[in-house]
């Protein structure tokens, strides 16, 4: 029964969501946001690394999934997002976790059924799928969406008779 940690990276707010897979069921274990206060980017990256490391220690996930970088109009923002992703990925690889990456379109398609879904639709569907009493905050909902996308990919591979391993883009191990 694998535990999946999903991460929605950001240089100011990084969302995380943890689910456990039991057969075809997904069980909510936890979610939240790592908020950085400093204007100093290296300090923010350390907060992200330390936060993800602590979540890994707390939940002991078997799999790590993260949203892939999108092309932003602002190059500086894209670079900062890439660095935030890097801090989270290093925390996962330090814990010997396999890393899988998914595009925003793949995540929305897995959760809502369309890659053009709005954030509010993702929040609503995450709440429904995981039977939560209220919609999670946006960044946490996105991270839970990443974990759900990974779960659906994992389930699809099993259904096709393949090994229960997901193609990763650079195994980061």
Swiss-Prot record:
InterPro entries: RNaseH-like_sf (IPR012337), RNaseH_sf (IPR036397), X-over_junc_endoDNase_Mg_BS (IPR020563), X-over_junc_endoDNase_RuvC (IPR002176). It holds the Pfam family RuvC. Mg(2+) 1 binds at residues 8, 139. Its cofactor is Mg(2+). It comes from the Bacteria. Binds 2 Mg(2+) ion per subunit. Mg(2+) 2 binds at residue 67. Keywords: Cytoplasm, DNA damage, DNA recombination, DNA repair, DNA-binding, Endonuclease, Hydrolase, Magnesium, Metal-binding, Nuclease. It is found in: Cytoplasm. One of its GO terms (cellular component) is cytoplasm. The RuvA-RuvB-RuvC complex processes Holliday junction (HJ) DNA during genetic recombination and DNA repair. Endonuclease that resolves HJ intermediates. Cleaves cruciform DNA by making single-stranded nicks across the HJ at symmetrical positions within the homologous arms, yielding a 5'-phosphate and a 3'-hydroxyl group; requires a central core of homology in the junction. The consensus cleavage sequence is 5'-(A/T)TT(C/G)-3'. Cleavage occurs on the 3'-side of the TT dinucleotide at the point of strand exchange. Belongs to the RuvC family. Homodimer which binds Holliday junction (HJ) DNA. The HJ becomes 2-fold symmetrical on binding to RuvC with unstacked arms; it has a different conformation from HJ DNA in complex with RuvA. In the full resolvosome a probable DNA-RuvA(4)-RuvB(12)-RuvC(2) complex forms which resolves the HJ. This is Crossover junction endodeoxyribonuclease RuvC. It comes from Shewanella loihica (strain ATCC BAA-1088 / PV-4). The gene is ruvC.
